[in-house]
Amino acid sequence: MPLNCIPSTVTVEAYEQKRASFADGMWVDVGTWGGVVPGNASSLVPMLAEGARGFKCFLCDSGVDEFPPVDEAQLRVAMTELKRVGGMLMFHAEMETGASVDGDQDPTEYATFLNSRPPAMEVKAIDLVVNLCREFGTVPCHIVHLSAADALPAIRAAKAEGLPLTVETCFHYLTISAEEVPTCSTEYKCCPPIRGQSNRDLLWEAVLDGTIDFVVSDHSPCTPDLKLHPCCGGKIAHGATEGDFVGAWGGIASVGIGLPLLWTEGKRRGLSLQDVARLVCEHTARHAGLGDRKGRIAVGLDADFVVWDPEEDNLIDAEKLHFRNKLTPYHERPCKGLVHQTVVRGSVVYDISQVDDSHSWENGFSKAPCGQWIDSPISRQ
């Protein structure tokens, strides 16, 4: 993503800096998205020429000063540029509706935060996206991390109209409901928020009927102090409240465990392994313009796959996860399915038989990273 880095990826120079920082340190192939912010429309086509897969924008405060939101007029300027070359624009689809936190509400209760970001924020934003998608016609538009099922009717109508609109949701929206979030447990905070069980069921219906095109992690970790989490033992910013959902960093950490999470919940709802492959591999590769290289096991494509046992018990242990800041809502969650090996372009880059007791994030990885930077031409096949 273009904003969880310094500098944000909103110019060609920032894109090149990010690419250089990844050199010789990747176990998987990596590409990046550029960002649309006020005033950078002239940088979009040059970033595409360098290899950016497309662009992301925010319709509300991103929480990052270097990545401000864009308004409707600024979107039109950006989409005019993207229309010249068929570039994709992805939307963090929330817009302000006037909802706020009442000063009398307890910020350590999840409901306080949830009520501050009602479904109407997503519905308002997605209505705008649909209108712009219709107006600009050939600009592929994508809704990232859909949370509110209230927006599904507008999405279904846009797709029935034949507009170039796609939509994703996330593992956490499909596997967690608001009713189960404990007090002070800020590891559950993300934006848009995890909503109630009935909303979750409607999202699943949209996954199963194809309204939602694919499922992703939206992995957004941070240090526990930024989460204002009780595990910090009071070591948080001066004046901050421990366990404050409103003030905590928003983001769910789940990279590497999405497959068992989706499979465990999806299997009982009628999801097949073929469906899982389509939702997390084939459609995501096509979305990133890599459908001619990745996303399927087929002659001529990159040999990227995992070797896993879909029936093996898997109790998620945060300390064994393969990322640095391990605060996650999935700690001690029982799942079905365990990855034994990960293969990238035919090379084994992870092998569970090589895992030891070190709890290092690279535990079990191959000694020599073989990942490549992806800047190949975009394919929509």
Q: Which positions does each model-derived feature cover?
A:
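His/Asp/Glu-enriched, well-ordered alpha-helical/loop segment
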Residues: 110-138, 187, 214, 221-311
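C-terminal cap of metal-dependent C-N hydrolases
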Residues: 232-244, 299-374
